[in-house]
From Swiss-Prot:
Domain EF-hand: from-to ranges: 13-48, 82-117
Protein name: Myosin regulatory light chain LC-2, mantle muscle
Blocked amino end (Ala) found at: A1
InterPro entries cross-referenced by the UniProt entry: EF-hand-dom_pair, EF_Hand_1_Ca_BS, EF_hand_dom, Myosin_RLC
Function: In molluscan muscle, calcium regulation is associated with myosin rather than with actin. Muscle myosin contains two types of light chains: the catalytic light chain, essential for ATPase activity, and the regulatory light chain, a calcium-binding protein responsible for Ca(2+) dependent binding and Ca(2+) dependent Mg-ATPase activity.
Positions contributing to Ca(2+) binding: D26, D28, D30, D37
Classification via Pfam families: EF-hand_7 (PF13499)
Record GO terms (molecular function): calcium ion binding
Keyword Phosphoprotein: no
Keyword annotations: Calcium, Metal-binding, Motor protein, Muscle protein, Myosin, Repeat
Anything else known: This chain binds calcium.
Gene3D superfamilies on file: EF-hand
Amino acid sequence: AEEAPRRVKLSQRQMQELKEAFTMIDQDRDGFIGMEDLKDMFSSLGRVPPDDELNAMLKECPGQLNFTAFLTLFGEKVSGTDPEDALRNAFSMFDEDGQGFIPEDYLKDLLENMGDNFSKEEIKNVWKDAPLKNKQFNYNKMVDIKGKAEDED
């Protein structure tokens, strides 16, 4: 007998974050994540894994990878994670030398051109609080600032 997937309780915020992640990866907006979506996403991150690696990712999900399947696949991974760690890990993907900094221009370019495409106004709002030094964005400091702000809510 097949095991029923374990139900994972996600907060509204986690659900919203997973929805945003799914939308960002679903480049052709057809409601499914396929091989081309993964290729586009990885190439926009500056890395193109071989097809067999991408196929292995897609094989983790029986059938087509729609949002429900995506939630099942990633919900378990997310539900036990600290949101600050998740944010730090997301930023670290763009930190080429692992020093805790992302070049300001590179980050602005990502915000303007990837996923939900931030407007110039939204970027200006993000930049108000951004810990910048020598045109480098300190994401560890940003995560700490955001974490303290969340605790006060």
